[in-house]
Amino acid sequence: MQTSNITNHERNDSSWMSTVKSTTEVSWNKLSFCDILLKIITFGIYSPHETLAEKHSEKKLMDSFSPSLSQDKMDGEFAHANIDGISIRLCLNKGICSVFYLDGDKIQSTQLSSKEYNNLLSSLPPKQFNLGKVHTITAPVSGNFKTHKPAPEVIETAINCCTSIIPNDDYFHVKDTDFNSVWHDIYRDIRASDSNSTKIYFNNIEIPLKLIADLINELGINEFIDSKKELQMLSYNQVNKIINSNFPQQDLCFQTEKLLFTSLFQDPAFISALTSAFWQSLHITSSSVEHIYAQIMSENIENRLNFMPEQRVINNCGHIIKINAVVPKNDTAISASGGRAYEVSSSILPSHITCNGVGINKIETSYLVHAGTLPSSEGLRNAIPPESRQVSFAIISPDV
């Protein structure tokens, strides 16, 4: 960011272009519009650095900008605003964005870096701003592939277009060892999913997240669990206590679900299918993807101006787990032990910005859990070899 004084007078160091750190102790509602605008070009409205209150103030300020008419396009002006009696013009000339504003009785010009310009552009309100032919657009990272490699080896590709549902570094990081992190993985995901970002289905019936949280708690899965521990199956009374605490005991409407979950929660293969679905499920802590976040916001900016702000939030992810009972090929017993096998599909679906608008990155892992599979890292490792796990990555973009 370069600042010059149009009147060739010495720039006032107390101007709004003085550095405003993200950790400023000044109350947000006491910041001047200049301080807020500086934060916008530094981080962008949708940065994970910003709180909801900060985003609200920033959005309110950016809503003041209107598209410039063709006859007003001095120096490539494409947007203007009058805030607190101060006139501000945004100009794009030869691919360089500048902000013109009044500082006392002087007109100042601030030239933005490419990152600052893109942060500013992505924060403008959903109006048609004419940026001219000089504006270049870079397509987002995209690709489709299937691989038998374990999940850690595809994280580098996945991270290019996804952020995480894990809100901070308080949760466990992805490990490189096969299934040794599985208990920590499900614990951190369920703990982080208080906003219902995780959905779990059995035969297309959604299992309430609170029920799953109570289940893993009863199974002894917590932040202190030994990664090599084999889970002990719950008794009927333990399962019944969990079920009754989540469903009204006298309500006959839930009888089918109560019977179903009572049966599933006592099946070691189902517990194995459920817990393994969270294993190294391509979730990454938000702090580790901030640079990728900035890159996405920088590279994909054209049509985002046409969408409402809530559609432009990039850190909006979902973890979808589907578990289906395997239908036997004949009428004989499903297995010698009377158990059943399960097909598992685990997908993370983070929304993102593309040149075509709002899209979805689908990162999916699918595999089979055989009847009788024991819920332990060793049991999962023996029953679900790497070659049985198919990881696919794709971008799904809407038609525009």
UniProtKB/Swiss-Prot annotation:
It is found in: Secreted. Inhibited by the cysteine protease inhibitors leupeptin and cystatin-C. The active site is at residue 34. Keywords: Hydrolase, Plasmid, Protease, Secreted, Thiol protease, Virulence. The keyword Protease applies. Its EC number is 3.4.22.-. Monomer. Interacts specifically with alpha tubulin, a major component of microtubule. This is Cysteine protease-like VirA. It comes from Shigella flexneri.
